[in-house]
Amino acid sequence: MRVENNNVSGQNHDPEQIDLIDLLVQLWRGKMTIIISVIVAIALAIGYLAVAKEKWTSTAIVTQPDVGQIAGYNNAMNVIYGQATPKVSDLQETLIGRFSSAFSALAETLDNQEEPEKLTIEPSVKNQQLPLTVSYVGQTAEGAQMKLAQYIQQVDDKVNQELEKDLKDNIALGRKNLQDSLRTQEVVAQEQKDLRIRQIQEALQYANQAQVTKPQVQQTEDVTQDTLFLLGSEALESMIKHEATRPLVFSPSYYQTRQNLLDIENLKVDDLDIHAYRYVMKPTLPIRRDSPKKAITLILAVLLGGMVGAGIVLGRNALRNYNAK
């Protein structure tokens, strides 16, 4: 019984062993076909590597500008808005926000070109607005680094131009408001002067009618509009001449307004050097390209060539066996 079982077991496994051996024999006999297929695949892979565009990614990290970088801008805002000037921290957030928006707009424009360019900006740390990671994909390592630095500078210049334009518009508006305020105060001061002269002239008429030529009071502080004629016609005539040649009287706010106007007029916006960002890490020079990967490409070529060659050998032998039957 033991011998019969062994024979049965041998009968069950021999076909599989023979098939596997036969398969290996077929592949060995067709090894030249497989080798040629692998060589062809490697040649195609080398050709692909020769013509494929390389991709190198340069990366930089930016954040909001330092206080010193926006000192001139902050001073200009103080001159224009005075006590209503935003906090320095608010200005920093505004500037980096404008930089981010302008950079995103540029990235979208480059992506929609006939030959798209990949420029990206995103937070460096998840769930945190700052710092920001910006990157550019180029065909060479040096080109990617140079292009990224160029686009960062381009966006910074654009934001700078926009800020200068905003400042000039605000300066023009502030100048107009201050000039209007000065004119209003001057008109009020002139009206007060004219009113004072008319009041004295009216008192002079009363004094002449009452034939009061000399002062009738000892303390001028006690004189009111109704009793002004008691100063006498001689004093009133002298007062009219004095008031007519006397300069307009202004409040301290008038002179403060004039000072503010002079400060705004002396403000030189074109001389401001405003930066909307600060480097945490300057554009890197990539040392490894993103694609194509030579090693992976060649390994895949060998595997694919071997599989294709094996398929050709097995398929050809199967077709021969079928025709023989």
Swiss-Prot record:
UniProt keyword Cell membrane present: yes
SUPFAM superfamilies: Bacterial polysaccharide co-polymerase-like
Swiss-Prot/TrEMBL GO biological process terms: lipopolysaccharide biosynthetic process
Membrane-protein topology: Multi-pass membrane protein
NCBIfam families with a match to the protein in the record: PRK15471.1 (NF012015)
Function: Confers a modal distribution of chain length on the O-antigen component of lipopolysaccharide (LPS). Gives rise to a reduced number of short chain molecules and increases in numbers of longer molecules.
UniProt-recorded name of the protein: Chain length determinant protein
Gene transcribed to yield this protein: wzzB
